[in-house]
Amino acid sequence: MALFRDIVLLGFLFCLSLVATVTSEEGATLLEIKKSFKDVNNVLYDWTTSPSSDYCVWRGVSCENVTFNVVALNLSDLNLDGEISPAIGDLKSLLSIDLRGNRLSGQIPDEIGDCSSLQNLDLSFNELSGDIPFSISKLKQLEQLILKNNQLIGPIPSTLSQIPNLKILDLAQNKLSGEIPRLIYWNEVLQYLGLRGNNLVGNISPDLCQLTGLWYFDVRNNSLTGSIPETIGNCTAFQVLDLSYNQLTGEIPFDIGFLQVATLSLQGNQLSGKIPSVIGLMQALAVLDLSGNLLSGSIPPILGNLTFTEKLYLHSNKLTGSIPPELGNMSKLHYLELNDNHLTGHIPPELGKLTDLFDLNVANNDLEGPIPDHLSSCTNLNSLNVHGNKFSGTIPRAFQKLESMTYLNLSSNNIKGPIPVELSRIGNLDTLDLSNNKINGIIPSSLGDLEHLLKMNLSRNHITGVVPGDFGNLRSIMEIDLSNNDISGPIPEELNQLQNIILLRLENNNLTGNVGSLANCLSLTVLNVSHNNLVGDIPKNNNFSRFSPDSFIGNPGLCGSWLNSPCHDSRRTVRVSISRAAILGIAIGGLVILLMVLIAACRPHNPPPFLDGSLDKPVTYSTPKLVILHMNMALHVYEDIMRMTENLSEKYIIGHGASSTVYKCVLKNCKPVAIKRLYSHNPQSMKQFETELEMLSSIKHRNLVSLQAYSLSHLGSLLFYDYLENGSLWDLLHGPTKKKTLDWDTRLKIAYGAAQGLAYLHHDCSPRIIHRDVKSSNILLDKDLEARLTDFGIAKSLCVSKSHTSTYVMGTIGYIDPEYARTSRLTEKSDVYSYGIVLLELLTRRKAVDDESNLHHLIMSKTGNNEVMEMADPDITSTCKDLGVVKKVFQLALLCTKRQPNDRPTMHQVTRVLGSFMLSEQPPAATDTSATLAGSCYVDEYANLKTPHSVNCSSMSASDAQLFLRFGQVISQNSE
């Protein structure tokens, strides 16, 4: 008995020693893996060799309860750099490896194929390169292989078909080439195949439908050719079929109607022929997108049977015939886009039954007849575009019922009659375009009640009467075009209240009076009042000097400073007889003035505070106080600043904007500062403004410009900032130095720095701060071309208790969030939109708004034919080694500028994506762990595998890890 007990004890001790040996080896393996990482934020601080350290409690490590073998390694979204160590193959018991959302580079090690128990491998959203190793095919237990959003090259290994349990294969957004291996189509358990955004060629194999369990098939944005297989109707398990943005030709096969997919995306190919009527039998369709092809014939009336379809995109084809009235039966329809075809006939009144319709676009067709009153029953209609047709009749007065409408474009038709007063009751309208019609009568003064209006175009009509003074109430307006009408009378004085207006076109009318009422419109950049009957002097102050003579020609009585202007004509000498009484009055007045001068000379002299930058205009206000916030400004007083800048003389001006002028001042210590003089002399709440400035003075970040001092006065407020010698990003891109080559690495560094500064304001300040005016001119550059945001938080700090919104300041045209017009609120996502426009500027070296073109609209117009990369600045293509990264930054910019704020990423997410693009030899500066995502916001987009019938395609874009997942999808969903 004792002998048996001893044997058992020895066996137990042996097992313990064996377990201790194994566990010791696994801990050493983990430390070996750590050596290959560059732990920027020291997130793996607990991975140490300390004797008391238990690797099973290390961050991201999970162990089996009995053997203590490592079974899961989850290091996702930790900002890890470096490579994946070959030592990972020594962890034989691993069931799951999740390294997604880092900045890992190098190749996937062949040794990963030694993890024989592995079921889940997710290396997505990194910078991994090289081929997909064939050794992965040895992982016979593997169920999920997710390698999307890397830089993998080469063909897809056909040996992946040898993994018997593989359910998810996601290789999207890489640089894979070659054809799709036909053997993959014979994997009966495969449920999800994501291959979008690669360089795959060849045809779509008829064997596709051998994948009897496949519900998600996505090959969007490749270079696939040939036709859609005739047998496609046999793929009865499909829920999502996306073949868009390839080079597919031929007709849409009849058998496609046997599919029961929720999403059918065929847009952006070269498909021809007619739309098969059998598509009208696909009752499960939620999204049908056939746009951007060569489809002809008429729209099948049977599509009206699709009562569960929410989005119908047939635009940019060659469709003819009329719009079927049966479309009015699609009761769930939200988006109906039929624009850019050859449709004829009328808009059927049956469309008025679509009470959930959000967007109706029939622009650029040959439609005629009146615009039906029945559309006023579409009470949720947000956007109506009928531009470029042959519509006649009058503007329906019933449109006043469309209270949700923000965009109304009736331009370039044959519409007659007056502008109905009822339009002024569409309170949320931000764009009203009635141009190029035959509208007559006067402009209703009640249009001045449209407080959210951003753009109004009534040009090229037969409008008479005057410009309503009520237009002065359009405080949000940015563009007004009344040109080429018969408008008379003066330019109303009330227009000087339009502090946000950028464009004003009044040419070719019969206006009289002068242009002095526009002198205070400081943000005005496009002005044309030519060919009217205006008289008087053109103002020389403020911003009128920027306008060319062409803006004023054709006004014989208008006096300007250009050649041949009446100002330069020889003027007749006018003889005036002066009475003795007048001479006596002048003499007495002169004596009084002389007496006042003598009294003033006897008083103690103090340096006068500035007024309009003049040295000879003393005023009676007391000297303002200079509040010092930085040691750089120590020992300075207000009088010092006035003396050093000669009372803010014009010769010290280094820039100006819509609300301020910026001066350069060299301090006593020979260090320069930038002085921003605000135009507003009477802040509504000086005390509140001072409180905000005190708060802003505490904000310090390497990518933010520091506030060094301030001076508040009813004469005008001064803000003192760091002076940055390289000026603004706008100067670098569009200013006198724009001929200078700007390489890709520098652009990426600037984009990353600006994003870090904005992310700090949004996520690390308490209370959080909305910038409200993100634009290239508010991104300054230091001597190393490091980006630093300026002008942040001046208006109002973000109030967390009020839904993080504020309406105090509007942004700049071209950069402003379109959602602002509907809500009158700016949020963090408004800053994200503006930042996206800045990214587009960096990528194209084009201005956000240039003359009458809009950069975002221009980019969007190039997306349908995959021509976006053609917009890239040539300096990028000549200095960037990997144009795939440029394409991804385009994707990121389009994500930032999505119309719906909830679809945009956060600035933390933006910084993480841009950080992943930075060159490994020049890593970005480390950020605090608080500046990274506190926890993974990743939403498992494959979670519907067990219940494929419940797939919700829209939810797939909600994942934090999908910030730049699908180039084509970003384009198609970024509707204007």
Swiss-Prot record:
Expression (tissue specificity): Mostly expressed in shoot apical meristems (SAM), organ primordia, flowers, siliques and young rosette leaves, and, to a lower extent, in stems and cauline leaves. Expressed in growing inflorescence stems and pedicels. Detected in epidermis, phloem and xylem.
A Gene Ontology BP annotation from the UniProt entry: regulation of cell adhesion
Deleted gene: phenotype: In er-104 and er-105, small curly leaves and compact inflorescence with short thick siliques, increased canalization of rosette leaf number during long days.
Glycosylation sites: N65, N74, N221, N234, N305, N329, N409, N457, N510, N528, N543
EC id: 2.7.11.1
Residues in LRR repeats: 69-92, 93-115, 117-140, 141-163, 165-187, 189-212, 213-235, 237-259, 260-282, 284-306, 308-330, 332-355, 356-379, 380-401, 404-425, 428-449, 452-473, 476-498, 500-522, 523-545
Regions of this protein lying in the Cytoplasmic compartment: 602-976
Cellular component terms per the entry's GO annotation: mitochondrion; plasma membrane
Outcome of mutating V886M: In strain: cv. Mt-0
Compartments it resides in: Cell membrane
Membrane disposition: Single-pass type I membrane protein
Phosphotyrosine PTM positions: Y721, Y760, Y815
Subunit structure: Homodimer and heterodimer with ERL1 and TMM. Interacts with EPF1, EPF2, EPFL4, EPFL5 and EPFL6. Interacts with SERK1, SERK2, SERK3/BAK1 and SERK4 in a EPF2-induced manner. Interacts with EPFL9/STOMAGEN.
Identification of the protein by name: LRR receptor-like serine/threonine-protein kinase ERECTA
Organism (species): Arabidopsis thaliana
